[in-house]
Regions:
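Glycine-rich phosphate-binding P-loop
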Residues: 132-163
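Generic detector of intrinsically disordered, low-complexity, polar/charged segments
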Residues: 65, 116, 144-146, 173
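FAD-binding core of FAD-dependent oxidoreductases
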Residues: 146-147, 153, 174-179, 186
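Active-site-proximal structural scaffolding
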Residues: 100, 121, 146-150, 171
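A noncatalytic interaction/capping subdomain that flanks phosphate/NTP-handling catalytic cores
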Residues: 1-139, 179-204
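Short beta-strand-centered segment that lines the nucleotide-binding/catalytic pocket of NTP-utilizing
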Residues: 164-181
Length: 204
């Protein structure tokens, strides 16, 4: 839910028990602040989001997330700081949030809010660039709800098209954006990794 109060103002944690995970969500710099007890979940983000460089970590972020704020609100909220031009998210401390998905989804929510602010279209789907044996290149985008089979369709495409497809480059596999430059649509991903159900893959 959107809030009209900056979450930083009601941060209730002990700074000595909190850490920052600076990462890139797409092209945006995100600082994820988390309580030490959620270290396992927070560090798992390294599988999906690129770790910011030392130089980037010293810059002003585009996004800020407070994960596990002991504010007693039992809420998941986001806020836009117009003065600083930063999107902020806050997830209240609760045993239920010990789930990596809460971290990932809030990071993506903040990214999507910032993307829409630029006029970009967030897409829940998959986008691939295909190079055929004759040199032609095509882009294919698949959209659908969770579990619809987007990732599995890409794997199936690799199998059934192996005689005509030279290479498949995955641009994004879960969440990305589409934007227009000089009248041409471009796709951009948010993550460097992806989750896939092993039982949906062919052996080998």
């Amino acid at each position: 839910n959107e809030t009209d109060t900056n979450p930083i103002t009601y941060f209730a944690g002990d700074p000595e028990e909190w850490f920052c995970f600076p990462c890139k969500v797409g092209k945006l710099l995100c600082f994820v602040y988390f309580n030490a007890k959620y270290t396992a979940s927070a560090l798992s983000m390294a599988n999906l989001f690129e770790l910011a460089t030392k130089e980037e970590a010293n810059q002003k972020p585009d996004l800020i997330l407070l994960f596990g704020n002991p504010d007693g609100k039992n809420a998941t909220e986001f806020y836009y700081d117009e003065t600083e031009n930063i999107w902020l998210g806050c997830i209240s401390d609760d045993p239920r949030i010990e789930y990596f998905g809460y971290l990932k989804k809030m990071c993506l929510t903040l990214h999507n809010l910032a993307a829409m602010q630029q006029g970009w279209l967030p897409i829940h789907g998959a986008f691939v660039n295909i190079t055929l044996n004759d040199g032609r290149k095509k882009g294919i985008m698949l959209m659908g709800d969770s579990g619809a089979g987007k990732s599995e369709s890409i794997e199936a495409l690799k199998s059934v098209g192996k005689d005509v497809i030279k290479d498949i480059e995955v641009v994004f596999d879960d969440m990305g954006t589409i934007h227009i430059e000089d009248g041409i649509p471009y796709g951009q991903g948010t993550e460097i990794g992806a989750f896939i159900r092993l039982d949906d893959l062919d052996p080998g």
